[in-house]
Structure formats: C-alpha cells, structure tokens
Amino acid sequence: MSSQDFDVEFVDRDDREARFVVRNITPAFANGIRRAILVDVPTLSIDTVRFVENSSVMFDEQLGLRLGLVPLTTPEDYAAGEAVTLALDVEGPGTAYSGDLVSNDPEVEAADENIPIIELKDDQRLELEADAVMGHGRDHAKHQGGVAVGYRHLQRVHVVGDSPEYADDDPQMLRGVIEEDDELVPTDDFDNDLTTRYPGKEVEIEDVDGAFVFHVESDGSMPVEELVLRAVDTLVDRADELEQAVQL
C-alpha cells in the first residue's frame, strides 16, 4: 500500500494531541499505525545515572527510575542508539524539578519543566549526571512517544424521518467524529447527543467502510504530527524490507 492509496484529513490538532481520519485502509493497517506509534518510533530517555551526591530521603535506584520516566524532547536527526548527557544540581530547601535538568545539547530538554523529582530539606542536595539514549517503546515503555493512541470507525449519520409525536426524548449518545454531508463533525460540538444535533428526527448510524478516526496524544518528546509521520515511515520501511526478502 503506497501513500497515494489512502487519504488523511485532520479534525483538530496541536503539538501534543490530534484527531485525524484515514480513509481507504483496512482494520489491520489501522492497527499497524497504532502499534507503530507506540513501539516503533525511537525517543530519548534517561538510561544511566551517575550520582555525585544524594543526601535526600530517596535511594539512588528510585530516583533513577523517576528520571527515566521524564519525557525528553527528541530532535529529528537523532538515530537509534545515539546518546546525550544531562546534569542536575539542586540544593534544599526546595524541590528538584525536571526543568532543572541541563543538557549538553540545547535541543534536548525535559518536555515538561514542572515534573517533581524529589523534595529536598535543609542541607540536602542532589547532584548527578545522566545519559539519555535513543530507544524504542517495544523495548521499554519509557520510550513510548505516544501516551494514548486509539482509533475507531468513522460513522455516518442519515436522517430517515421525523420522530413519532409522543416518542421519548431520551438522549442518543455518540462519541467521536461523524461524517455529515461529506464534512467531519466532532460529536463534542453538540455534547455527544444526536438528539441535540437532529431534534425531532429519527437517524440511522453506519460505519464508513475503510475509514478510521485516530486520536493520538504525544508525551512531548516530539510534536504529534511528527510522531505519526515517523510511525508511517517505519511501516513503509518494513514493507520494503519484506519485499526485498521475498525477492531473494
């Protein structure tokens, strides 16, 4: 399947979250996109920590685990296996935050600056040096750039007539995105209630063949659009490798 075989249309997006519709794909390919976003796009994550001083109440190993789960911005030109060094030096009283991490690459920093690492009391200090390496989510969850990835069929709504005169006016809830007159409408625009969108009408709902609505959230290691594009690239690379292997 080439990129010309399917069509992508964004419903809404920002740096961290996006909803988009992909058409002309199979359920298997949709699931392949979901899995690729979760496990095939490499990201930077702290892997090794060297403690210079730790007089806090928390053991080195526990702090190392916390640091490993801090999302780091991942430049596009970093390849799997590459590393970057970060340092942290904080004295109490106060709290050491993810934003206190200083990288030797200005393009690499904590994706969120306000993640608490440890609270330090008077005369307590945390000084360390850490190596962050590129890795895949299939090897460790800390490398999953997609923190929430899901998809569902795009649904089309048809008005089939008027509601009976004395019909119960119960809410008819539907969540996601619907297709209406060839336009995409998020259901939260009408509080997810079809009776609000189509008052006094009877409607029928059907799945649109080969069309899926994706909802993707990034941990901040990269913009969500870049995360999706990198995931699709990994699928293309796998397909090319398989084609070459079959030809052999």
Curated annotation (Swiss-Prot):
Keywords: Cytoplasm, DNA-directed RNA polymerase, Nucleotidyltransferase, Transcription, Transferase. SMART domains: RPOLD (SM00662). Gene3D superfamilies: 3.30.70.3110, DNA-directed RNA polymerase, insert domain, RNA polymerase, RBP11-like subunit. PROSITE patterns: RNA_POL_D_30KD. One of its GO terms (biological process) is DNA-templated transcription. Its EC number is 2.7.7.6. It is found in: Cytoplasm. GO terms for cellular component: cytoplasm; DNA-directed RNA polymerase complex. Pfam families: RNA_pol_A_bac, RNA_pol_L. It catalyses: RNA(n) + a ribonucleoside 5'-triphosphate = RNA(n+1) + diphosphate. GO terms for molecular function: DNA binding; DNA-directed RNA polymerase activity; protein dimerization activity. HAMAP family: RNApol_arch_Rpo3. DNA-dependent RNA polymerase (RNAP) catalyzes the transcription of DNA into RNA using the four ribonucleoside triphosphates as substrates. NCBIfam families: PRK00783.1. Belongs to the archaeal Rpo3/eukaryotic RPB3 RNA polymerase subunit family. Part of the RNA polymerase complex. This is DNA-directed RNA polymerase subunit Rpo3. It comes from Halobacterium salinarum (strain ATCC 700922 / JCM 11081 / NRC-1). The lineage of its organism: Archaea, Methanobacteriati, Methanobacteriota, Stenosarchaea group, Halobacteria.
